[in-house]
Amino acid sequence: MEKRKIILDCDPGHDDAIAMMMAAKHPAIDLLGITIVAGNQTLDKTLINGLNVCQKLEINVPVYAGMPQPIMRKQIVADNIHGETGLDGPVFEPLTRQAESTHAVKYIIDTLMASDGDITLVPVGPLSNIAVAMRMQPAILPKIREIVLMGGAYGTGNFTPSAEFNIFADPEAARVVFTSGVPLVMMGLDLTNQTVCTPDVIARMERAGGPAGELFSDIMNFTLKTQFENYGLAGGPVHDATCIGYLINPDGIKTQEMYVEVDVNSGPCYGRTVCDELGVLGKPANTKVGITIDTDWFWGLVEECVRGYIKTH
């Protein structure tokens, strides 16, 4: 099995924590570093959340703080979904784990420049860190093997009728990434909403046990409530974790190649990922867009990762 070298760029975040849990444990993934961006909450909060998850699950991977603001737009957060801390629900021990002193953007640039072009970037929050790295050092572009991101939708948005939160939180950054020429895989809402985590899934992970089973339960029981209140969903989708699933085994997710453009014009479609599903524009595809996911396979994968944290001694 090939180990995919990745940098996970996230804004923890409930589903981000599940993505971290999976990426750090599955043997098909070589998690080099975790970079944190503002998104679901402000950077000071998303950083603490990322460090708390690493400390609880003993994820011994360096964590780097990145962009505290979007490139241009006024900052927004998703406190209606993720709560005041950005990771409401779990109770963590006093935090002793610390972030690295290097800025996340510098870490991304330095790591890619020193690589053989075999590192995949996995941004599952706003694309601010990735876009700034691309603008600061364009020489990283040919060094990026692939970008597998959570964001966007070819159908309806979730933060506006047109836009998904991660893209809407920094559309200009998304525009930089989608015009970069780097191979892109997009897990948008059309796919990720298929991973609604219902009470029976939570019970399954509780039965699996260990610190990851406990954390999964605390996290997803909180989003059960907020997702129903905001969207009428029967549970919280684990949006970000689909990217890790794809990297472990892309056969579990059906994708379609499309030309995708991010709308950065002010107006009702600001932040929309315009996906040319039918090819009517005649432009070459720049993105593999997730369409459907084998949910039985996916939840089995999540459980496998949860069980990986159970200590046998």
Curated annotation (Swiss-Prot):
Cofactor: Ca(2+)
GO cellular component term, pick one: cytosol
Positions that bind substrate: Q227, H239
Entry keywords, A to Z: Calcium, Glycosidase, Hydrolase, Metal-binding
Keyword Thylakoid on entry: no
MF-aspect GO terms: calcium ion binding; purine nucleosidase activity; uridine nucleosidase activity
EC numbers, comma separated: 3.2.2.8
Xref: InterPro entries: I/U_nuclsd_hydro_CS, Inosine/uridine_hydrolase_dom, IUNH, Pyrim_hydro_RihB, Ribo_hydro-like
GO biological process: purine nucleoside catabolic process; pyrimidine nucleobase metabolic process; pyrimidine ribonucleoside catabolic process
Catalytic site positions: D11 (proton acceptor)
Reactions the enzyme catalyzes: a pyrimidine ribonucleoside + H2O = a pyrimidine nucleobase + D-ribose
UniProt cross-references to CDD domains, sorted A to Z: nuc_hydro_IU_UC_XIUA
Cofactor mode of binding and number, as noted: Binds 1 Ca(2+) ion per monomer.
Residues that bind Ca(2+): D11, D16, V124, D240
Origin: domain of life: Bacteria
Function: Hydrolyzes cytidine or uridine to ribose and cytosine or uracil, respectively. Has a clear preference for cytidine over uridine. Strictly specific for ribonucleosides.
Assembly, per entry: Homotetramer.
Annotated family: Belongs to the IUNH family. RihB subfamily.
UniProt-recorded name of the protein: Pyrimidine-specific ribonucleoside hydrolase RihB
Taxonomic source organism: Escherichia coli O9:H4 (strain HS)
